[in-house]
Protein backbone atom coordinates (compact mmCIF):
# COMPACT_ATOMS: atom_id res chain seq x y z
CA UNK A 1 0.00 0.00 0.00
CA UNK A 2 1.27 3.45 -0.88
CA UNK A 3 0.11 6.56 1.00
CA UNK A 4 1.03 9.74 -0.87
CA UNK A 5 1.48 12.83 1.32
CA UNK A 6 1.07 10.46 4.28
CA UNK A 7 1.23 13.16 6.97
CA UNK A 8 0.71 11.66 10.42
CA UNK A 9 0.62 8.12 9.03
CA UNK A 10 -2.95 7.28 10.08
CA UNK A 11 -3.66 5.35 6.87
CA UNK A 12 -0.29 3.61 7.06
CA UNK A 13 -1.01 2.54 10.64
CA UNK A 14 -4.46 1.24 9.70
CA UNK A 15 -3.17 -0.87 6.79
CA UNK A 16 -0.11 -2.07 8.75
CA UNK A 17 -2.39 -3.21 11.60
CA UNK A 18 -4.06 -5.47 9.01
CA UNK A 19 -0.68 -6.98 8.07
CA UNK A 20 -0.20 -5.08 4.80
CA UNK A 21 3.21 -3.87 3.69
CA UNK A 22 3.01 -0.08 3.71
CA UNK A 23 5.00 2.71 2.08
CA UNK A 24 4.51 6.39 2.77
CA UNK A 25 5.84 9.47 1.00
CA UNK A 26 5.85 12.93 2.56
CA UNK A 27 8.16 15.91 2.87
CA UNK A 28 8.19 15.30 6.65
CA UNK A 29 7.91 11.70 7.83
CA UNK A 30 8.53 12.23 11.57
CA UNK A 31 4.87 11.86 12.62
CA UNK A 32 4.31 8.92 10.29
CA UNK A 33 7.33 7.17 11.81
CA UNK A 34 5.72 7.45 15.25
CA UNK A 35 2.34 6.07 14.14
CA UNK A 36 3.55 3.46 11.66
CA UNK A 37 7.01 2.29 12.76
CA UNK A 38 6.97 -0.70 10.39
CA UNK A 39 6.32 1.47 7.33
CA UNK A 40 8.81 2.12 4.58
CA UNK A 41 8.93 5.91 4.69
CA UNK A 42 10.37 8.14 1.99
CA UNK A 43 11.05 11.73 2.98
CA UNK A 44 10.76 13.59 -0.32
CA UNK A 45 9.60 16.90 -1.71
CA UNK A 46 7.48 15.40 -4.49
CA UNK A 47 6.46 18.79 -5.86
CA UNK A 48 10.00 19.96 -6.61
CA UNK A 49 11.97 16.76 -7.14
CA UNK A 50 11.68 13.60 -9.23
CA UNK A 51 9.17 10.96 -8.12
CA UNK A 52 11.08 8.85 -5.53
CA UNK A 53 9.38 5.58 -6.52
CA UNK A 54 10.73 5.43 -10.04
CA UNK A 55 14.13 3.98 -10.90
CA UNK A 56 15.66 3.94 -14.37
CA UNK A 57 12.27 4.78 -15.88
CA UNK A 58 10.50 1.92 -14.06
CA UNK A 59 7.62 3.03 -11.86
CA UNK A 60 7.06 1.05 -8.67
CA UNK A 61 3.42 -0.07 -8.39
CA UNK A 62 1.24 -0.97 -5.41
CA UNK A 63 -1.87 -3.04 -4.70
CA UNK A 64 -3.44 0.02 -3.09
CA UNK A 65 -2.69 3.73 -3.46
CA UNK A 66 -4.24 6.17 -0.99
CA UNK A 67 -4.27 9.96 -1.28
CA UNK A 68 -6.24 12.24 1.06
CA UNK A 69 -6.34 16.02 1.30
CA UNK A 70 -3.56 16.47 -1.25
CA UNK A 71 -3.49 17.65 -4.85
CA UNK A 72 -0.50 18.27 -7.07
CA UNK A 73 -1.77 18.05 -10.63
CA UNK A 74 1.62 17.30 -12.23
CA UNK A 75 1.60 14.01 -10.25
CA UNK A 76 -1.95 12.85 -11.06
CA UNK A 77 -0.85 10.62 -13.93
CA UNK A 78 1.96 9.14 -11.82
CA UNK A 79 -0.48 8.48 -8.96
CA UNK A 80 -2.86 6.59 -11.26
CA UNK A 81 0.01 4.70 -12.91
CA UNK A 82 1.25 3.61 -9.46
CA UNK A 83 -1.77 1.31 -9.10
CA UNK A 84 -0.71 -2.27 -9.89
CA UNK A 85 -2.87 -4.60 -12.03
CA UNK A 86 -5.77 -5.68 -9.83
CA UNK A 87 -4.99 -2.83 -7.41
CA UNK A 88 -7.17 -0.04 -6.10
CA UNK A 89 -6.88 3.75 -5.93
CA UNK A 90 -8.60 5.57 -3.07
CA UNK A 91 -8.39 9.33 -3.53
CA UNK A 92 -10.18 12.13 -1.68
CA UNK A 93 -9.32 15.80 -1.71
CA UNK A 94 -10.83 19.25 -1.78
CA UNK A 95 -12.92 20.37 -4.72
CA UNK A 96 -14.22 23.55 -6.31
CA UNK A 97 -16.79 25.12 -4.01
CA UNK A 98 -14.59 24.69 -0.95
CA UNK A 99 -13.42 28.30 -1.32
CA UNK A 100 -16.84 29.37 0.03
CA UNK A 101 -16.37 27.24 3.15
CA UNK A 102 -12.73 27.71 4.08
CA UNK A 103 -9.27 26.54 3.15
CA UNK A 104 -7.90 25.54 0.81
CA UNK A 105 -9.43 28.18 -1.40
CA UNK A 106 -6.89 28.57 -4.22
CA UNK A 107 -7.97 26.92 -7.47
CA UNK A 108 -4.55 25.22 -7.65
CA UNK A 109 -5.59 23.09 -4.67
CA UNK A 110 -9.21 22.40 -5.65
CA UNK A 111 -10.32 19.71 -8.08
CA UNK A 112 -12.62 20.91 -10.83
CA UNK A 113 -15.90 19.04 -11.49
CA UNK A 114 -15.17 15.58 -12.87
CA UNK A 115 -11.39 16.05 -12.69
CA UNK A 116 -10.78 12.85 -10.72
CA UNK A 117 -12.98 10.90 -13.12
CA UNK A 118 -10.94 12.18 -16.04
CA UNK A 119 -7.64 11.37 -14.30
CA UNK A 120 -8.86 7.80 -13.67
CA UNK A 121 -10.13 7.18 -17.20
CA UNK A 122 -7.93 4.07 -17.54
CA UNK A 123 -9.32 2.50 -14.35
CA UNK A 124 -12.65 0.90 -13.51
CA UNK A 125 -14.48 3.38 -11.26
CA UNK A 126 -16.22 1.59 -8.40
CA UNK A 127 -17.45 4.71 -6.59
CA UNK A 128 -17.25 8.46 -7.14
CA UNK A 129 -18.64 11.39 -5.20
CA UNK A 130 -18.44 15.15 -5.50
CA UNK A 131 -20.12 17.04 -2.70
CA UNK A 132 -20.16 18.59 0.74
CA UNK A 133 -19.06 16.95 3.99
CA UNK A 134 -19.58 18.33 7.50
CA UNK A 135 -17.38 18.54 10.60
CA UNK A 136 -15.57 20.49 9.34
CA UNK A 137 -17.64 21.74 6.40
CA UNK A 138 -15.81 21.13 3.12
CA UNK A 139 -16.36 20.24 -0.53
CA UNK A 140 -14.54 17.14 -1.75
CA UNK A 141 -14.23 14.72 -4.61
CA UNK A 142 -13.52 11.10 -3.79
CA UNK A 143 -13.02 8.06 -5.94
CA UNK A 144 -12.43 4.34 -5.58
CA UNK A 145 -11.12 2.83 -8.79
CA UNK A 146 -9.55 -0.50 -9.78
CA UNK A 147 -6.93 -1.27 -12.39
CA UNK A 148 -7.86 -4.36 -14.40
CA UNK A 149 -5.99 -7.49 -13.35
CA UNK A 150 -3.33 -8.72 -15.75
CA UNK A 151 -5.58 -11.62 -16.86
CA UNK A 152 -8.73 -9.49 -17.34
CA UNK A 153 -9.05 -10.36 -21.02
CA UNK A 154 -10.34 -13.83 -20.15
CA UNK A 155 -13.31 -12.28 -18.33
CA UNK A 156 -13.23 -8.54 -19.10
CA UNK A 157 -16.71 -7.86 -17.69
CA UNK A 158 -16.03 -9.58 -14.35
CA UNK A 159 -14.22 -7.75 -11.57
CA UNK A 160 -12.99 -9.45 -8.42
CA UNK A 161 -14.77 -7.85 -5.48
CA UNK A 162 -13.40 -8.31 -2.00
CA UNK A 163 -13.47 -6.31 1.20
Language-model segments: which ranges?
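Short alpha-helix
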Residues: 108-122
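A short acidic, Gly/Pro-enriched loop at the edge of an enzyme's catalytic core
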Residues: 52-64
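Helix-to-beta-strand junctions that scaffold the AdoMet/dcAdoMet cofactor pocket
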Residues: 83-84
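Conserved S-adenosyl-L-methionine
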Residues: 124-134
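Core SAM-dependent methyltransferase catalytic element
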Residues: 134-163
Amino acid sequence: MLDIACGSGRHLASFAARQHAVTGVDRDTNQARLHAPSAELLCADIENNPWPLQTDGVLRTFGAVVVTNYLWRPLLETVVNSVAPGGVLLYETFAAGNEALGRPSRPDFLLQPGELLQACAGLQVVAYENGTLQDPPRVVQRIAAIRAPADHRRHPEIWRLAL
